[in-house]
């Protein structure tokens, strides 16, 4: 059971309060043959001094922040970690989240029992204000547009899936779009070899300095991100030769963003 090497890719930026718990959750897995790669994106806090305590058990990569956009920096860090990895099964983890001890073995068993799967999404528990709640999966009224978006730390996949993402230039444009949205969309709308499970395996920490924390609903940046998401979706459908027509949501978003630009100017 523990023969196959499995890679855990951790991305971190200024998570000194949480990064040790994140690392320990990987080291304390009940699956032994792990390759743990952590990319620190030029943290300015004590993150690196904490990470270095475990340098004999981790592969540590230091990376510059090359973009003004946090989502793009995280994407670049993840690509760097992927290039360093050697496992055929890969689990993602943000520096402020953590795994429960049986996560790796449970995910591996799911892939073993379902050989046709490329991606497994596990619905995480949310930790906010010292309280745990389960992430609610919302009903999608237009299933052809927005995927059910599981946070990054709940995404596990075969190596070939991410190689396909790179081949289709999934990460090259739209710097405000997070990695989890891109991976969820590609898996659920394009490749369709995925499974969403509700077992409690991952703790997703909701913090004030997270990538999405500063994007308030219906704010200027919210509409901007939504419009970029629409264009991203159209690009991917086109590249995969899938016919898709712009709908009312797209035009509402485009007009609203245009009006907001007029007001700001």
Over which residues does each language-model region extend?
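Acidic donor-binding/catalytic loop of UDP-sugar-dependent glycosyltransferases
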Residues: 46, 97-110
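A conserved acidic beta->alpha catalytic loop
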Residues: 40-49, 65, 94
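Short, acidic, metal-binding catalytic loop of nucleotide-sugar glycosyltransferases
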Residues: 24-33
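Flexible acidic/His/Gly-enriched loops in nucleotide-sugar-dependent glycosyltransferase catalytic domains
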Residues: 63-82, 104-166, 215, 234, ...
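The conserved acidic donor/metal-binding loop of glycosyltransferases
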Residues: 94-98, 123
């Amino acid at each position: 059971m523990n023969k196959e090497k499995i890679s855990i890719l951790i991305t971190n930026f200024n998570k000194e309060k949480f990064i040790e718990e994140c690392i320990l959750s990987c080291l304390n897995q009940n699956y032994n043959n792990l390759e743990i790669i952590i990319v620190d994106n030029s943290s300015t806090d004590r993150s690196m001094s904490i990470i270095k305590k475990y340098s004999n058990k981790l592969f540590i990569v230091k990376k510059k922040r090359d973009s003004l956009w946090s989502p793009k920096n995280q994407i670049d860090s993840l690509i760097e970690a992927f290039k360093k990895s050697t496992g055929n099964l890969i689990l993602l983890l943000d520096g402020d989240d953590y795994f429960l001890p049986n996560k790796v073995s449970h995910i591996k068993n799911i892939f073993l029992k379902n050989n046709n799967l490329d991606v497994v999404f596990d619905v995480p528990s949310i930790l906010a204000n010292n309280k745990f709640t389960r992430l609610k999966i919302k009903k999608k009224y237009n299933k052809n547009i927005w995927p059910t978006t599981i946070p990054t730390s709940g995404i596990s996949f075969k190596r070939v899936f991410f190689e396909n993402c790179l081949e289709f230039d999934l990460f090259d444009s739209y710097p405000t779009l997070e990695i989890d949205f891109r991976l969820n969309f590609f898996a659920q709308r394009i490749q369709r070899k995925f499974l969403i499970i509700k077992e409690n395996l991952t703790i997703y920490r909701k913090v004030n300095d997270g990538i999405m924390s500063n994007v308030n609903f219906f704010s200027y940046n919210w509409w901007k991100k939504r419009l970029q998401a629409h264009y991203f979706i159209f690009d991917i459908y086109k590249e995969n030769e899938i016919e898709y027509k712009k709908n009312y949501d797209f035009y509402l978003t485009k007009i609203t963003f245009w009006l907001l630009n007029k007001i700001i100017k």
